[in-house]
């Protein structure tokens, strides 16, 4: 190449650099002024870089608006790395490069662009050059914004028809360098540069979300049935599939048209819960007279002759000796209209955790109150279990309550209407305060659990002429049916486990149904298991079990030691969520101190027990209106309602209260006292 050509090229290059420096404030492209003119004869690179657009086969991969190109340039056709402070660190590759740029062939080792291509800095005006670059500039990429834990939606964007995502993303990256022309005005360059930077920093933003440094920035999703169209469609398809398999006729054929109801007997210690349960089993024929006579003789020999009916429920030797129920007893009886499972909860304060586990499996609560003088006051006063059991039952979803005023035949009471009204009045006020509708959800009746008066047969009018209402069994048989979700996704919180010729788990089916041989998923371990055998309330093997049933399942695919109460058997297509962080509405019912960020306690949710701590208080709810405060409260005390972020030590299986009430409500306890109740409103991603 002649000296004159070299001089012309050098002049053009310096002129182009000067134009870029004037337009961009002499900051971004100052490195080009340091270009070594002595290296020109080896490759003719001046023309190739004047467009600042890069090649498809060797262009710039990423542009930094602060100071030049950061990443490596393809060594087949130019500089290997550009120094952000100004200038290239290494000389160009003398091998040059050949390729094709926008259908124009080039050979940058021997010649400029072929096929009549004219460098962009020669033969055109500044205005023409700007127009060309505007047309070539790519449109801003659409960004994805997570708006639901169950799916991803495009926010403020529409998808182009017929565009392949992989090719589109590749072209967007290749064109990212083309939009950085040095001759544009600063106001026109900065805005598109910022938009182009967003996709580059996506990885950094994702890391910030996973660390969740700020609770107020939590990406949380409130699960609703309409949150994600795809999930709704799949759920509808599953429900439709299961509806074809199970209908009302199948249920009627299996159980003779009788639905199943789980009852929990609760109340203060020595209120007569186990005795009443044992008498119900005897009166309905579930326990024969010979067995009762046997228990009566054994109780008399042990000096406990008045406890023989309770021995039907209390099978443990320690329970019989002390006259106190320790664990939740289970029994089954049947009437002409319904099938029942009795859950006999322990009344002692030491065993409240067992009572909570029993209440989580119940449909209807039977609150047993002793009318005997002194016993009623002890049970209902602060510290007694009557109030706490009623509160826990409401928290666990027991919305129907039968309050039986027991021991009405005691000599201190003698079926007194005045004593009965006193008990009813005090309990009514408390039940109303914790959320029960006294007119529709609660019924009161006087009974004698020991003599059986008003359990199955009406009390003698001579003894109690003032009560004309139904007996306990009459009311249970005629009350409204409990809503069942037979064709919903299968879910069974595990209440107990054992090893008997394999792994056996026990619990109440909260939704859906299960068949022998069906595959399920054990959460939170995400272990696939197979149902080998199904046993109903009477220990008989069946082929199918429905929502509301108390069952035992022999499962294959997991060992007994790998299961804990609180695990959930769930549908593989719609598994329950397993989380450690969620947002909940909490009502503080009993607390001597205060709750603030960092406060730890024990959470009971369905059959699970897990340690939990308060991450942050978000809002305080006004009394009456539940209006959220704008500023987060510094602490919470007794009587307050707050919205807070909670975090568990280990993953726990939960759902939002709106989707699955039974799996979205919980109780907080500390130092043997129930301090708060709550419901899950959002689940953190």
From Swiss-Prot:
Residue span of region Prion domain (PrD): 5-135
Domain of life: Eukaryota
Positions of the UniProt region annotated as G4: 406-409
Localization in the cell: Cytoplasm
Positions contributing to GTP binding: 267-274, 406-409, 449-450
Gene from which this protein is expressed: SUP35
Name recorded for this polypeptide: Eukaryotic peptide chain release factor GTP-binding subunit
GO cellular component, one term: cytoplasm
Chain segments carrying region G1: 267-274
Region (Interaction with PAB1): 2-239
Polar residues biased stretches: 117-129, 223-234
């Amino acid at each position: 190449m002649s000296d004159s050509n070299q001089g012309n090229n050098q002049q053009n290059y310096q002129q182009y650099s000067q134009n870029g420096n004037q337009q961009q404030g002499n900051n971004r492209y100052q490195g080009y002024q340091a270009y070594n003119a002595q290296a020109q004869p080896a490759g003719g690179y001046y023309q190739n870089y004047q467009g600042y657009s890069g090649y498809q086969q060797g262009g710039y991969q990423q542009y930094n608006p602060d100071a030049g190109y950061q990443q490596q340039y393809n060594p087949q056709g130019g500089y290997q790395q550009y120094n952000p402070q100004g200038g290239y660190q290494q000389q160009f590759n003398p091998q040059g490069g050949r390729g094709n740029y926008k259908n124009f062939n080039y050979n940058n080792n021997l010649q400029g662009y072929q096929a009549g291509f004219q460098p962009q800095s020669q033969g055109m005006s500044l205005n023409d050059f700007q127009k060309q670059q505007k047309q070539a500039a790519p449109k801003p990429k659409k960004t994805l914004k997570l708006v639901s834990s169950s799916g991803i939606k495009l926010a403020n964007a529409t998808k182009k028809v017929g565009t392949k995502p992989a090719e589109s993303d590749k072209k967007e990256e290749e064109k990212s360098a083309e939009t950085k022309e040095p001759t544009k005005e600063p106001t026109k360059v900065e805005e598109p540069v910022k938009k182009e930077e967003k996709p580059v920093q996506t990885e950094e933003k994702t890391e910030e979300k996973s660390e969740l440094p700020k609770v107020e920035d939590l990406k949380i999703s409130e699960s609703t049935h309409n949150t994600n169209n795809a999930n709704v469609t799949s759920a509808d398809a599953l429900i439709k599939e299961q509806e074809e398999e199970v209908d009302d006729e199948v249920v009627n054929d299996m159980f003779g048209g009788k639905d199943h109801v789980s009852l929990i007997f609760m109340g203060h210690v020595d209120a007569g819960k186990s005795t009443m349960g044992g008498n119900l089993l005897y009166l309905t024929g579930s326990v024969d007279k010979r067995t009762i006579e046997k228990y009566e003789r054994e109780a008399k020999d042990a000096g406990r002759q008045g406890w023989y009916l309770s021995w039907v429920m209390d099978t443990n030797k320690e329970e019989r000796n002390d006259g106190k129920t320790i664990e939740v007893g289970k029994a089954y009886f049947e009437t002409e209209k319904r099938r029942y499972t009795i859950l006999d909860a322990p009344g002692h304060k030491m065993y409240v955790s067992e009572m909570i586990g029993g209440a989580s499996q119940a449909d209807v609560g039977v609150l047993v109150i002793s009318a005997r003088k002194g016993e009623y006051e002890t049970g209902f006063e602060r510290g007694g279990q009557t109030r706490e059991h009623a509160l826990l039952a409401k928290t666990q979803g027991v919305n129907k309550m039968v309050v039986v005023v027991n021991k009405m035949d005691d000599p201190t009471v003698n079926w007194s209407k005045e004593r009965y009204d006193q008990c009813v009045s005090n309990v009514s006020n408390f039940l109303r305060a914790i959320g029960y509708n006294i007119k529709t959800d609660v019924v009161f009746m006087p009974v004698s659990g020991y003599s059986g008066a008003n359990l199955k047969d009406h009390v003698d009018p001579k003894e109690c002429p003032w009560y004309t209402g139904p007996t306990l069994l009459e009311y249970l048989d005629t009350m409204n049916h409990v809503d069942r979700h037979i064709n919903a996704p299968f879910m069974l919180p595990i209440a107990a486990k054992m090893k008997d010729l394999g792994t056996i788990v026990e619990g109440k089916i909260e939704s859906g149904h299960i068949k022998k041989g069906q595959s399920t998923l054990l959460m939170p371990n995400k272990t696939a298991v197979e149902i080998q055998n199904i046993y109903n309330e009477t220990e008989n093997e069946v082929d199918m079990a429905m929502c509301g049933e108390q069952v035992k399942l022999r499962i294959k695919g997991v060992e007994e030691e790998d299961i804990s109460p609180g695990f959930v058997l769930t549908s593989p297509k719609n598994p329950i969520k397993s989380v450690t962080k969620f947002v909940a509405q909490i009502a503080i019912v009993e607390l001597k101190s205060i709750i603030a960020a960092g406060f730890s306690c024990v959470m009971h949710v369905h059959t699970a027990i897990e340690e939990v701590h308060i991450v942050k208080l978000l809002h305080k709810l006004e009394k009456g209106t539940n209006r959220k405060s704008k500023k987060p409260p510094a602490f919470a005390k007794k009587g307050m309602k707050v919205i807070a972020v909670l975090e568990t030590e280990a993953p726990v299986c939960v759902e939002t209260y709106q989707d699955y009430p039974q799996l979205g409500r919980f109780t907080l306890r500390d130092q043997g006292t129930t301090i708060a109740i709550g419901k899950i409103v959002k689940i953190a991603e």
